[in-house]
C-alpha cells in the first residue's frame, strides 16, 4: 500500500476542480489523448505501457496524495497488467444525462459530448467487468456527487492499513 492514491475517474466528475483545490493532487487525466495522437496501434500500446510505468513510479514516490488518471479502457487494461492498486470512479449509467449537462456547462462542444458519451457508455460496462478480481476498487458516483465527495470513502479503503504497515 502506498501513500499516494491513484484515482481513475470519468469525465465530468470534478477531477479538475478537485486538483485545482489541492496542491497534493496531480491531474494526469488529459495526457492520454496527447501521448497517443497519430500513433499506430502498436506504438499506442508501447506509449500506454510507458505512461503506466511512470504513474506507478509516481505512486511509489509519495510526492502526491492523489494522482488522477484516465478511465480509457486501454489504460485500465494496462493498470491491471501492471497490478496497480487504485480506485476507479464511474457513474451509474442511468445518470448519464447529468454528465451530459455538466459537459455542456463546462463548455464542451456538442460533437465532443456525442462522441464521448457514445464511447463512454459502452466503456463503463467493459471497465466494470475488466476490474473484477483485481486491485482496482470500484466507486460509483451518484448524479449529485463529485469526486471530492467520494474522497473520504476512498481514503477509508486505501489508507486504513497504513497505520499497520
Regions found by a protein language model. Give the residues of each.
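Conserved beta-strand scaffold positions in the cores of enzyme catalytic domains, especially
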Residues: 25-27, 86-88, 135-140
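Short, charged, surface-exposed secondary-structure boundary motifs
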Residues: 35-39, 95-104, 149-151
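Structural motif
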Residues: 8-10, 69-73, 91-92, 141-144
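Conserved nucleotide-sensing/catalytic segment adjacent to the nucleotide-binding pocket
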Residues: 23-82
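Generic beta-sheet signal
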Residues: 3-7, 63-69, 86
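Glycine-rich phosphate-binding P-loop
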Residues: 3-22
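Conserved phosphate-donor/acceptor-positioning beta-strand/loop module used by diverse small-molecule
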Residues: 68-71, 82-102
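Small-molecule kinase domains that catalyze NTP-dependent phosphoryl transfer to phosphate-bearing small molecules
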Residues: 108-165
Amino acid at each position: 500500500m502506498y501513500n499516494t492514491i491513484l484515482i481513475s475517474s470519468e469525465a465530468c466528475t470534478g477531477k479538475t476542480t478537485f486538483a485545482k483545490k489541492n496542491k497534493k493532487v496531480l491531474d494526469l487525466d488529459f495526457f492520454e489523448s496527447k501521448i497517443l495522437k497519430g500513433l499506430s496501434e502498436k506504438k499506442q500500446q508501447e506509449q500506454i505501457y510507458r505512461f503506466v510505468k511512470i504513474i506507478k513510479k509516481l505512486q511509489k514516490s509519495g510526492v502526491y496524495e492523489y494522482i488522477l488518471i484516465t478511465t480509457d479502457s486501454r489504460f485500465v487494461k494496462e493498470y491491471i497488467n501492471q497490478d496497480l492498486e487504485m480506485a476507479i470512479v464511474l457513474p451509474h449509467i442511468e445518470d448519464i444525462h447529468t454528465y451530459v449537462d455538466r459537459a455542456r456547462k463546462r463548455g464542451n462542444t456538442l460533437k465532443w459530448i456525442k462522441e464521448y458519451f457514445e464511447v463512454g457508455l459502452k466503456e463503463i460496462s467493459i471497465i466494470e467487468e475488466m476490474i473484477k478480481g483485481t486491485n482496482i476498487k470500484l466507486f460509483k458516483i451518484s448524479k449529485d456527487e463529485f469526486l471530492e465527495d467520494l474522497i473520504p470513502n476512498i481514503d477509508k479503503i486505501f489508507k486504513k492499513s497504513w497505520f499497520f504497515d
